[in-house]
């Protein structure tokens, strides 16, 4: 009986995860963990929270999001290149706002893993992340 319940909950979690818009495959040294996704009171908009971890020396290339991104650094230090601005290095406790559809990239400039809590306020139903050449 207990096994059935656990399997049922597991199927629900897997089913819920598969409904999320597809993001690029995990890159070596980069781990993205979807934490939550909720509709907003504004039609066609949703908020998404993701924990993003980068191993030391790893970079995540240029990309955009279909809405605003607010970054809160949890640990380590990451350098961000945001289109039209000088590079900025964030450490634990720092925050960064990235406007909608702004090209940006990140890399871990430290000797320890870097982790951020990324909060996105985006257009519902669009891919959360689009890589840029």
Positions of predicted regions on the chain:
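A short, N-terminal "cap"/entry segment at the start of jelly-roll beta-barrel domains
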Residues: 2-51, 97, 127-133
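A short beta-loop-beta micro-motif enriched in histidine and acidic residues
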Residues: 45-47, 57-72
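Conserved hydrophobic/aromatic beta-strand scaffold that supports enzyme active sites
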Residues: 49-51, 70, 95-97, 118-119
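Short acidic-glycine-tyrosine-enriched beta hairpin
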Residues: 54, 84-101
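Short histidine-centered beta-strand/loop micro-motifs
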Residues: 60-65, 82, 89, 107-109, ...
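Glycine- and acidic-residue-biased ligand/ion/polar-headgroup-sensing regions
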Residues: 66-84, 94
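Ligand-binding loop in jelly-roll beta-barrel domains
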Residues: 79, 87, 101-126
